[in-house]
Amino acid sequence: MNRMTLLEADGPATIRAAVVQCIDEVRSVTSGSGSSDSAVIAGIGTTAAHALKGRLLHDALLAERVDLAGTVHFDNPVELLGDSRWSLALVLSPWKQEVAPAIPTLTPSAAQTGVVDTVVRGSEGAVGVNTNSWASQAAMETLMGGRTPKSVLILGSGGSSNSVALACRRAWPQVRLIGSARNVEALSRWAQRFSAECCGPAALAELLRDEPPSLLVNTTTWGETDASEAAPFAFEFGRLTSPGNQFFDLNNRVSALQTSALQAGMNVMSGTFMQRATNACRAALSKARMR
């Protein structure tokens, strides 16, 4: 894979670069495009009802001057894909990997990862889009500040881990990429797909040889809510931190992991920048969706 950077002079420009790539991917798999100033947006997933009301989405729609005509929430992919009212759909956990096989047209990023986080609908039908790969790449490149990490460690095995792995391979094709998760079977699938080393949490210190990764990424849901932090974290977090290294937590909430990383002297980014980039992609897709 050839190196492709999104990094620009500042954060807003980097987000715009991610949006351009996301739009271009959709146009590469469908002929013809149009524009729309209004949208009915659907959502599916554990936090979809909250996301549909969220400020980050509404800020992005306002920036693109898209009028939100309504929102609809569904409990499963069958209900979502069987409803004709919506023009754009947010696909959140745990459905990102389950929805992809049900959509005949996928963007290259969605096809490479098997992950769909957004569906855009036009006259030619529905297209499954992976905005998260572009958004996470924008976030990680911003956090690295133009430097190339010596190693990247991704914690987790769900849909987001696949998106982040693809983003790493686009930004830094030759980087040492490592994955660790309790679900070793799911972990092995994305590790093989993106030429990464992998192991369970217990073997991680040995694999790293006690050399913390330059860029540490948490794609797990630990830290997403107060309740999630009630259980012990699966990893020895202190052994993964090092002063001056980078920690990217996909969770928007300021979690205990982020606090620990800051106390260890790391450069820390929450998931908010990534979510702003994701929603910027979604709003732009709604504005310029296929007809």
Say what each PLM segment does:
Residues 170-176, 264-267:
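Conserved S-adenosyl-L-methionine
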Residues 32-35, 145-148, 169-173, 209, ...:
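Short, conserved loop/helix-junction motifs that constitute active-site signature segments
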Residues 194-269:
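Rossmann-like adenosine-cofactor binding region
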